Amino acid sequence: TEEIGHRQAGPGISSSRTSIIEALLENGSMSRSDLANSIGLSRSALTVLSRGLIEQGLILESSGSYDNQQTGRPSILLSLNAEHGYFIGAGLTEDPPMMVLTDFHGNSLAQHRMRDAEQPRAVASAIEAGITELIRVRKISRQRVLGIGVALSGYVDHARGICVQSNALGWRDVSIAEIIERVTKLPTYVDNDAHAVATGQKLFGHARESKNFSIVMLGKKIGGGHYIHGRLHRGHTGAAGEIGHYTVVPGGARCGCGKQGCLDMFATSTAILEKAAESGLKTETVAQLESIAAKGESRAIELLRHAGAMLGVVVANSIQMNNPELVLIVDVVGFGNGFFTTSTRQAIENNILPHLIAKTRLELHSVDKDFLARSASSIAAHQFLIDQTSY
């Protein structure tokens, strides 16, 4: 076994071969010559390193397109072996909380709705029950599960596996990774939900080919995550990306974090629906409010536009701070593509330097109910597949 932080984990990948794994994650199948060129290795060095990975079963060889220089012989392609092992993901602050079983390609193979639990040990027991169900459904042995990733809303000390504070769960200074490991006997890694989403998008999602990108997680809370030069940016204490707590109205409404005027108090689904109710508009979802606005209801239009503009200004400031090539806005509760997102896009364009507009790709994605759990599984996948020091 290999030491990870303060915990023991399963066999990881040697740092000398990390670049091979990263290239295959980014590009899928590659020939040896293309792979060697992309990571700056000689063909002979690449052959030696890849042989070890093939013997371990981590990568596979397959026939590719025909190579005219070799008299019609098909080239041999290398790719990650999707079935080498599996990862568990648990999204604790999803509604409802979900678990998934994923493979080395990030595919969701089985899903499980976790039973409700609030106390950390009860959560660990619920995860253990979920693992039993997931491997039963997929008919795999427990020994092939390589790790558990846990994502939650709040401030997380990833290196120590501690939930420092989560208002959503009512936790403070909970060693949740260690608690889950004791119950499941599996290496467990915990992270902030937005950081988990960023990791998942880099490994298996829309940002695989991006070295510098940002994600904005839009739902009952707003979170952010940034990849800079191909690595997740955590900041000095691990709190980088807390855009939901950018001050947008100095002296404004008090947030659950203790500050006043945070973005979370104006642009989350919770805040928007509360303000809609105060205006006499009784709706249960932002999608319903968008539908009312589409029929010409001026109060709904103004509310959505104002909230969207606030988000847009914050995203614009973030773009100017980090200069990403890509910004992914991930809609986890069904905002849709209406007045809110249109206003967000306009505010971004109106508040960033002109030369950055054409240089920054902006994408909006709506996601499935198990999205956070899938993102959580990528925490464990990253820990196994990528050099430990990259965290």
What are these model-predicted stretches?
Residues 153-156, 219-221, 333-334:
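Short glycine-rich anion-binding loops that position phosphate/pyrophosphate groups of nucleotides
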Residues 95-97, 155-157, 223:
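Short, acidic Gly/Pro/Ser/Thr-rich loop/turn segments
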Residues 77, 87-91, 145-149, 213-217, ...:
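Short glycine-aspartate micro-motif
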Residues 103, 158, 227:
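Short, acidic, Ser/Thr-enriched surface-loop or helix-capping motifs
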Residues 1-65, 69-111, 115, 119-143, ...:
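ATP-binding/phosphotransfer module of carbohydrate and carboxylate kinases, centering on a glycine-rich
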Residues 111-113, 119-123, 172, 179-194, ...:
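Glycine/GP-enriched mid-protein hinge/lid loop-to-helix segment characteristic of carbohydrate kinases
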Residues 108-212, 338-350:
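Glycine-rich phosphate-binding loop and adjoining helix at the ATP-binding site
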